[in-house]
Every structure is written in C-alpha cells, then in structure tokens.
C-alpha cells in the first residue's frame, strides 16, 4: 500500500493520510469506549505507553541512540514540548471521561471545537490579531455546541459535556504549543516526548486506582494504542505532503466515521438536534480554517510586495 501511495502526487497523499487519520481516530475512540468504565489514567497509560514505544523506535531509527536531545528535547524546544505535554495530559483525561458518557459522534464533534480555541489562544499567547469574522465564527461554533449538548434535555449530562469542551480547549492549547515549537523539534521527538512523559506522570494515578482488567478489555486497550500510533503519524504525514488549506476540511471526517461506528458497535445514533449542531460546528470550523489561510496568504503576499 505504501508503494502505491508513494506513486501519487503530494496533494493526494496528504488527502489519503488525513482520511486515515480520521478513520483511525474514530476507531481509537470506539475501542476506548468499548473498554468500559475503567479509570481514565489506566486507559491513558495503555494508549500513550504503546505510542511512546513507536515514537522511541521512530526517533532511534532516524537519529540513532546517542543523541538524547532527540528523545527529551533541548534548551530550544523543552518549553514547547512541556506545554504540549501538559495540555495533552489534561486534554486526553477530559476527552476520555467525556467519551465514557457521551455518544461517540457527540464526543468527537465537541473535540473538534479545538479549532476555535486555537484562534483564542493564539490571540492571547502568541499576540496574533483576531478579526471580526473570526469572532463571529467562534460564536457560531459555540452556539452549535450548545445545540449539540442541548441543556434543556432531560438526559443532559453537564459534567461530560463540560469535560469534552475543556478537552477541546486543551487540544487547542496543544496545537498552539506545536506552532510555538515550529521546526524546533522533529515530529518523532514530539510524539515520543509527549506519550512517554504523559505515561510516566499518569502511572502513579493509575496505580492508586488500579483496576484488574479482563482479557477482552486489555485487548481493546492494546488495539487502541496501536491505532493511536496510526493517528499520530498519519496527521504528521498529512501536513507534510499537502498544505493545510487543502486538506484541513477533511480532518472533520472523524465525526462521520464516529457516527457510523457508534451506530454499528453501540447501536446509538445522534438526534436530529444534535446533527444540526454537528453541521453548525463543522461548517463554522471549516469557514474559520479557510478564513485563517486566506489571512496568511494575504499577509504573505503583502510581505513579498513590500
């Protein structure tokens, strides 16, 4: 399969990888949800620990074993790596908690609110300008979230909904930290550092509330970890081969996959109001992404003209 992909043009490669990312993200979440109500720390250690092994192999293969900075960072990138790890730990903890109580597609679409938090955090921490249209689209996105969680419903669960939104905020912080890192760290270093450090930090919490796992639960968690390896490297590969503006729209396909898997595996399907909310969030997110790329292109053209 890799040989066939290599024969394609870069844009097509990027599109294929972003679709693989969306599919395996949905599969990972399905497996984690199927594992049942076990402590979040335990789920995270399994998933991230397995991915850390893959990251270690990738770093060692690319740079050899002697250069420790390729594994644990250096003065130039340790701050960005640490911020990314903190946001990642908080984000995955919140997202896994939400995943246990919300239907799969709802948890996925609320995670996609992260694109709005990227703009907010970039304005606060990176001093990037925020324009009126961006503010409007952010408000529309959060309105869509309100429609999805439907606080007037009898079945409204405030804690999982807030956890999903908080997880999206942390995912946004994760993305901003990656922008702060820029080219200061290789993708394999970022993957290894986050997954290894987060697994180490969460291990004591796992041991304090350790739950003996059944065989099928263990298998689900191991498979989730293996699928998450594909998620991490597919995303990196997608943006390596194609500009973000050409493939970012397709990153929201995970919601479609999640809805399908949720129906097939759990027999759940979102209500009409929730689907309307999904459409509002995804439409606002796509417009925001396209608008951001338009701003970058205009800024770049102005610099070249000057």
Indicate residue ranges for each PLM-predicted region.
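Glycine-/small-residue-enriched transmembrane alpha-helix faces in small-molecule transporters
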Residues: 1-42, 154-180, 300-306
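Membrane-interface interhelical linkers
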Residues: 1-23, 52-83, 132, 156, ...
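Hydrophobic alpha-helical transmembrane segments of multi-pass membrane transport proteins
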Residues: 23-27, 31, 82-97, 147, ...
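C-terminal transmembrane-helix exit sites in multi-pass transporters
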Residues: 95-97, 114-136, 256-275
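Helix-helix packing/entry segments at the starts of transmembrane helices
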Residues: 107-113, 181-197, 232-263
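Hydrophobic transmembrane alpha-helices of multi-pass small-molecule transport proteins
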Residues: 133-150, 273-292
């Amino acid at each position: 399969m890799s040989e066939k992909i290599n024969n394609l043009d870069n844009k097509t490669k990027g599109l294929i990888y972003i679709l693989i990312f969306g599919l395996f993200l949905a599969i990972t979440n399905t497996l984690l949800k199927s594992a049942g109500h076990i402590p979040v720390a335990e789920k995270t250690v399994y998933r991230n620990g397995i991915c850390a092994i893959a990251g270690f192999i990738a770093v060692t293969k690319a740079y050899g074993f002697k250069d420790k900075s390729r594994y644990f960072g250096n003065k130039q990138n340790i701050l960005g790596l640490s911020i990314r790890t903190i946001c990642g730990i908080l984000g995955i903890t919140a997202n896994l908690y939400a995943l246990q109580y919300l239907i799969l597609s709802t948890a996925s679409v609320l995670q996609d609110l992260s694109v709005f938090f990227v703009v907010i955090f970039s304005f606060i921490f990176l001093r990037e300008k925020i324009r009126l249209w961006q503010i409007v689209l952010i408000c529309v996105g959060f309105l869509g979230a309100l429609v999805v969680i439907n606080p007037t419903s009898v079945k409204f669960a405030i804690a999982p909904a807030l956890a999903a939104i908080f997880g999206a905020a942390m995912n946004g912080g994760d993305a901003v930290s990656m922008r702060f890192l820029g080219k200061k760290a290789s993708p394999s270093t970022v993957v290894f550092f986050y997954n290894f450090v987060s697994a180490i930090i969460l291990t004591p919490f796992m041991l304090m509330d350790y739950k003996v796992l059944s065989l099928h639960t263990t298998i689900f968690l191991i498979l989730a970890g293996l699928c998450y390896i594909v998620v991490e490297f597919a995303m990196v590969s997608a943006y390596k081969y194609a500009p973000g503006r050409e493939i970012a729209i397709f990153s929201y396909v995970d919601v479609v996959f999640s809805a399908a898997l949720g129906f097939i595996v759990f027999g759940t399907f979102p209500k009409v109001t929730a689907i309307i909310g999904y459409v509002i969030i995804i439409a606002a997110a796509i417009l925001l992404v396209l608008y951001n790329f338009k701003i970058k292109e205009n800024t770049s053209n102005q610099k070249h003209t000057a």
